[in-house]
């Protein structure tokens, strides 16, 4: 799970 991806999108 990429928590970072959530912010990036």
From Swiss-Prot:
Q: How is the cofactor bound?
A: Binds 1 heme b (iron(II)-protoporphyrin IX) group per subunit. Binds 2 calcium ions per subunit.
What reaction is this protein's catalytic activity? Answer: 2 a phenolic donor + H2O2 = 2 a phenolic radical donor + 2 H2O
Compartment(s) of residence: Secreted
Leader sequence range is none
Any GO CC annotation of this UniProt entry: extracellular region
Molecular-function annotations in GO: lactoperoxidase activity; metal ion binding
State where it is primarily located: secreted
Q: Which domain of life is it from?
A: Eukaryota
Q: Which cysteines are joined by disulfide bonds?
A: none
**Alphabetically, which GO biological process terms does the record hold?**
hydrogen peroxide catabolic process
Instruction: Give its E.C. classification number.
Output: 1.11.1.7
Which keywords does this Swiss-Prot/TrEMBL entry list? Calcium, Heme, Hydrogen peroxide, Iron, Metal-binding, Oxidoreductase, Peroxidase, Secreted
Cofactors needed by this protein, per the record, are:
heme b; Ca(2+)
* Broad EC category: oxidoreductase
- Belongs to which family? Belongs to the peroxidase family. Classical plant (class III) peroxidase subfamily.
Q: What does this protein do?
A: Removal of H(2)O(2), oxidation of toxic reductants, biosynthesis and degradation of lignin, suberization, auxin catabolism, response to environmental stresses such as wounding, pathogen attack and oxidative stress. These functions might be dependent on each isozyme/isoform in each plant tissue.
> What is this protein called in UniProt?
Peroxidase 4
In its UniProt entry, the species of origin is given as Solanum lycopersicum
Lineage in the entry?
Answer: Eukaryota, Viridiplantae, Streptophyta, Embryophyta, Tracheophyta
